[in-house]
Amino acid sequence: MLRNSRKIFTGNVVSDKMNKTITVVVNVYKKDLLYGKIVKKSRKFYVHDETEKAKKGNLISFMETRPLSKTKKFRLLKIIFSNDKDKKQ
């Protein structure tokens, strides 16, 4: 698979409890063709986070890669938005 043809997704981190792995949810909103109602569909991905910088609540970008384990087939590209509630000023 060429590096340029790999899929890139954006989603929210919902869990960071595993070592070097985060769970990300990607929400897709589609309009129902028959009734016209907007329907939300979500999908979970396991993403490899080598540096363990992504935390729960962050908005991240990740891309498809070779299989890293039975369930991990994506790796972290960048953290788009970081929710820094833990920092004290």
UniProtKB/Swiss-Prot annotation:
Pfam families: Ribosomal_S17. Disulfide bonds: none annotated. One of its GO terms (biological process) is translation. Keywords: Ribonucleoprotein, Ribosomal protein, RNA-binding, rRNA-binding. One of its GO terms (cellular component) is cytosolic small ribosomal subunit. GO terms for molecular function: rRNA binding; structural constituent of ribosome. SUPFAM superfamilies: Nucleic acid-binding proteins. InterPro entries: NA-bd_OB-fold (IPR012340), Ribosomal_uS17 (IPR000266), Ribosomal_uS17_bact/chlr (IPR019984). It comes from the Bacteria. Gene3D superfamilies: Nucleic acid-binding proteins. One of the primary rRNA binding proteins, it binds specifically to the 5'-end of 16S ribosomal RNA. NCBIfam families: PRK05610.1, uS17_bact. Part of the 30S ribosomal subunit. Belongs to the universal ribosomal protein uS17 family. This is Small ribosomal subunit protein uS17. It comes from Phytoplasma mali (strain AT). The gene is rpsQ.
